[in-house]
A protein has these predicted regions:
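Alpha/beta-hydrolase fold active-site loops
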Residues: 50, 76-77, 133, 158-159
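Gly/Ser-rich "nucleophile elbow"/oxyanion-hole loop immediately N-terminal to the catalytic nucleophile
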Residues: 42-47, 87-115, 129
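Extracellular/periplasmic catalytic domains that process cell-envelope and extracellular macromolecules
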Residues: 44-47, 71-74, 104, 153-156, ...
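Active-site machinery of serine-nucleophile hydrolases
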Residues: 51, 55-97
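Primarily recognizes the serine-hydrolase "nucleophile elbow" in alpha/beta-hydrolase
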Residues: 107-155
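A domain-start/cap signature at the N-terminus of enzymes
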Residues: 1-50, 180-185, 193, 209-220, ...
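The feature captures the conserved acid-bearing segment of alpha/beta-hydrolase catalytic domains
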Residues: 139-223
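Cell-envelope and extracellular/periplasmic
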Residues: 56-57, 99-102, 114, 125-126, ...
Length: 226
């Protein structure tokens, strides 16, 4: 194993980003609107912020963007969860809408996927490498059999990060074979892949490492890229 080293729910009549709280009330959203949007504390319209596009797994109705960003950074990023994280068009709609309303650096857009969403993040980024500055997968498999690194000249310079818990289960999550195959693929293709492997510190060793324990490393990796 290799070791390398408050949100608001969107509404059409949205709150002013100059509001100190950066919070709006939770509402029922039109399908074209992002599911959740996070503005950094002290948002300044004259500064172009990196945009983080979060892709939680499709059955995770409890993903809390605000809590996640509080653990990651309150000031560095704008962040959004698309209305349908499993749909590429929905992802780009969320990006376009956020860029039309807030100050986003068009060359600093990062995909961050969790488990199943991590595979989608790899997929979307490799299919559209010019649209993203980097991609992070948390316990999500790289789609090994889709030829995503076939567009070698376009994809090999795209920074990618894989965060994995050594205790993840097989199935939709990573296992040792997935990790080894992914490392061999990137080595052969000359792709840019940074990996973090997290050791479980629980007493019985069965509980997975939480996303909150990983976001600090993701923040540092992105800021190094910026």
């Amino acid at each position: 194993m290799v070791h390398q080293s408050t949100v608001f729910h969107y509404e059409s009549n949205h709150c002013s980003p100059s509001s100190r709280g950066s919070l709006c009330n939770e509402v029922n959203l039109p399908s074209s609107e992002p599911e959740q949007l996070f503005l950094p504390r002290g948002y300044e319209s004259g500064y172009d912020y990196p945009l983080l596009v979060w892709l939680p797994q499709s059955d995770d109705a409890h993903f809390d963007l605000g809590r996640t960003m509080m653990r990651m950074s309150l000031r560095n990023y704008i962040a959004v969860v698309p209305a349908d994280p499993s749909d590429l068009e929905s992802c780009f709609e969320a990006i376009d809408l956020t860029m039309s309303r807030y100050s986003v650096h068009s060359r600093r857009i990062y995909l961050i996927g969790v488990e199943e969403g991590g595979g989608n993040a790899f997929r979307y980024a490799c299919q559209n490498p010019e649209s993203f500055a980097g991609v992070v997968s948390v316990n999500g498999q790289f789609p090994l059999r889709e030829g995503l690194l076939g567009q070698f000249d376009r994809v090999r310079s795209l920074p990618m990060m894989l965060c994995c818990d050594e205790k993840t289960k097989t199935g939709e999550l990573l296992n040792d074979r997935d990790v080894n195959q992914t490392l061999r693929l990137f080595h052969a293709a000359g792709g840019l892949l940074s990996m973090r492997v997290y050791r479980n510190k629980s007493t019985d060793g069965t509980q997975q490492v939480s996303l909150g324990d990983m976001v600090g490393d993701i923040d540092r990796w992105i800021m190094d890229e910026v």
